[in-house]
């Protein structure tokens, strides 16, 4: 299940995100928070000590029965900017960021996992007919 808190005026179709959530975590709730650039900067500064806005952050919760898997926070203005720059829909960019974030909630770590997260993202991109992922774009 997906719980969405859109704190921005930007609108999007979230149906594909429900499908992605059901594939990746069929028995767990995922919270998706859509924020402004400034809010993302504050969250990044407070949680990671990095004083800049980023595109997506993940906050896993402890593995306690009947609690959400965690929260994925997406910077909507940055997602919109990336979608325009890369020539695809905002919904696709949000889906890519969401996949990336949920994989982190599930324990994947592209900085340490020897390509496992990249492989899983690639599989999901094909399944949901999406453009290149964050990791794939970074490596191109």
UniProtKB/Swiss-Prot annotation:
Keywords: Cytoplasm, Endonuclease, Hydrolase, Metal-binding, Nuclease, Ribosome biogenesis, rRNA processing, Zinc
Binding positions for Zn(2+) per the UniProt entry: 100, 104, 110
Keyword Hydrolase: yes
GO molecular function: metalloendopeptidase activity; RNA endonuclease activity; zinc ion binding
Assigned GO CC terms: cytoplasm
Top-tier EC class: hydrolase
Alphabetical list of Gene3D superfamilies matching this protein: Metalloproteases ('zincins'), catalytic domain (3.40.390.30)
Cross-referenced PANTHER family: ENDORIBONUCLEASE YBEY, CHLOROPLASTIC
HAMAP family referenced in this protein's UniProt entry, alphabetically: Endoribonucl_YbeY (MF_00009)
Protein's name according to its UniProt entry: Endoribonuclease YbeY
């Amino acid at each position: 299940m997906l719980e969405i808190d859109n704190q921005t005026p930007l609108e999007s179709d979230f149906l594909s995100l429900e499908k992605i959530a059901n594939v990746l975590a069929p028995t767990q709730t995922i919270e998706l928070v859509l924020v402004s650039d400034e809010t993302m900067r504050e969250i990044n500064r407070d949680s990671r000590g990095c004083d800049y806005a980023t595109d997506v952050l993940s906050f896993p919760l402890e593995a306690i029965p009947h609690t959400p898997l965690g929260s994925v926070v997406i910077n909507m203005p940055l997602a919109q900017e990336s979608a325009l720059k890369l020539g695809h829909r905002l919904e696709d960019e949000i889906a890519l960021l969401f996949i990336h974030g949920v994989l982190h909630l599930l324990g994947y770590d592209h900085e340490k996992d020897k390509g496992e997260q990249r492989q899983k993202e690639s599989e999901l991109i094909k399944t949901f007919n999406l453009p290149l992922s964050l990791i794939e774009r970074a490596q191109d």
